[in-house]
C-alpha cells in the first residue's frame, strides 16, 4: 500500500529528486533518467533526452504517493510526460485546483507550476514543483534545466501559466 500523498510530501520528494541530480545525456555521462522514463513504455532514454520536465513531475508525484495513471482520461493531447497534459488533467478533474498564473496568492509548497515561453517561444514549455514561496519568487524543483534536475529561483511573472494543486490523499478514479 502506498503512503498517503500530500502536497508537503510532494515538495519534499521533489526537492530530494532535484538535488540527486537526475540528468539526460551529458558530456562524459550516460543518462540516469531510467526511473523517470520507465512509466512511459513507448518512450526511450534518447527520445526523453532534453524533454523530460513533465516526466520528472510525474515521477515525483508517484514517489510522493499520488496514484495517477500515465494518461488519465482527461488527457486528450498526450500522456503526463507532456506539459500540456498536466493542464488538461487538472482542468478535467474537478478535485484538482487549477489557478491562472496571475493569482499570486494561490501557490504554496507542493503545487505544480506550469510555464509559458521559458525555454522556447511556446505555451506549456516547462513545469516544476514549488518547494517554497517567497514574496515575489518561487523556489522550484525542476527536471530538465539544461538536461539536469535542480533547484531554481523563478520570479512570479508572466511566464507562469498556471498553478496546479493535487489534493492531499488524491487517488485517480
Please state what every model-predicted region is:
Residues 1-71:
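N-terminal capping segments
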Residues 4, 8, 67-148:
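...with weaker cross-activation on analogous glycine-rich loops/strands in unrelated enzymes
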Residues 12-15, 82, 86, 159, ...:
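Intrinsic disorder/low-complexity segments
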Residues 15, 25, 58-59, 98, ...:
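Sequence-level detector for tyrosine residue identity
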Residues 30, 45, 61-64, 94, ...:
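Short linear sequence elements within intrinsically disordered, low-complexity coil regions
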Residues 37-40, 90-93, 149, 156:
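Solvent-exposed, flexible loop/coil residues
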Residues 133-173:
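Active-site signature of cysteine proteases
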Amino acid at each position: 500500500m502506498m503512503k498517503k500523498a500530500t502536497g508537503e510530501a510532494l515538495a519534499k520528494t521533489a526537492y530530494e529528486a532535484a538535488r540527486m541530480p537526475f540528468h539526460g545525456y551529458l558530456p562524459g555521462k550516460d543518462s540516469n533518467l531510467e526511473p523517470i522514463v520507465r512509466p512511459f513504455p513507448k518512450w526511450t532514454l534518447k527520445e526523453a533526452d532534453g524533454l523530460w520536465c513533465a516526466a520528472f513531475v510525474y515521477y515525483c508525484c508517484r514517489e510522493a504517493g499520488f496514484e495517477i495513471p500515465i494518461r488519465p482520461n482527461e488527457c486528450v493531447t498526450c500522456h503526463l510526460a507532456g506539459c500540456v497534459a498536466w493542464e488538461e488533467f487538472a482542468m478535467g478533474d474537478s478535485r484538482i485546483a487549477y489557478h491562472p498564473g496571475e493569482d499570486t496568492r494561490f501557490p504554496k509548497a507542493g503545487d505544480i507550476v506550469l510555464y509559458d515561453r521559458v525555454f522556447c517561444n511556446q505555451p506549456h514549455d516547462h513545469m516544476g514543483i514549488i518547494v517554497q514561496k517567497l514574496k515575489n519568487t518561487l523556489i522550484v524543483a525542476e527536471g530538465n534545466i539544461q538536461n539536469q534536475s535542480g533547484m531554481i529561483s523563478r520570479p512570479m511573472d508572466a511566464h507562469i501559466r498556471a498553478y496546479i494543486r493535487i489534493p492531499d490523499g488524491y487517488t485517480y478514479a
